Amino acid sequence: MNINDFGFTLPEELIAQEPCENRDHSRLMVVNREGGMIEHRLFFEIIDYLKSGDLLVINDTRVIPARLVGKKGTGGKAEIFLLERDNGAEDVWECLVGGKRIRPGVFIQFNDNLKGEVLEEVGDGRFKIRFHTGRDLEEVLEEIGQVPLPPYIRREKDEGGRMKDESTIDRGRYQTVFADKKGAVAAPTAGLHFTEPLLKKIKAKGIDIASVTLHVGPGTFLPVRVENIEDHRMLPERYEIPSASAEMINRAKTEGR
């Protein structure tokens, strides 16, 4: 299949730049698989399409503040996007790096508590970077890292490239209400519309809920650079399925639910 077969027009004014005031009041499109009929509802009405005995599987990954902006020794700006922790070292991450003349041996200063050392180039703009800090890296990221919003969500930036007055709404709303295990660099967006009251109503209707963890990776937003879709290389993502959840899912499938 050719990538051009998937092209369509999406007017910019139809791309919401702020979340709906109430999570579960986002729009919901329902397609009837038998007749193809389309209904336009609100998300909290999803409960009308679930019945007692159904199993709802949720992704409890938590988005990390993976965007860092710093300066090289020359004074040039460098933007870092953390992708995945290296298996061999706690302080080494594979990162997407934006900026000129990034090469092994370059140091990037983010603030007084954090600097990065470029170790090696992996390819496609990705580098392995060792982070130097006298504190816990996750704590520092929570303080100075920024939410990795999708590129179609625009926020004003200062001269250094950081988002101005990062919204607490962005910090909170770009997580699901059941976000728990840190590791995603993008939100599992289908889950963003659930609320605690809606989940309680779902449980009260006799619907079971099972949690799995899929750390959403950069492949969810990186561009497809090939003409033939079959030539596109999907990036791997880490996941974990607890034994209790696996049992619930297998039982539901066996029973045809």
What would you call each of these model-derived segments?
Residues M1-R257:
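Surface-exposed, charge/polar-rich loops and edge strands
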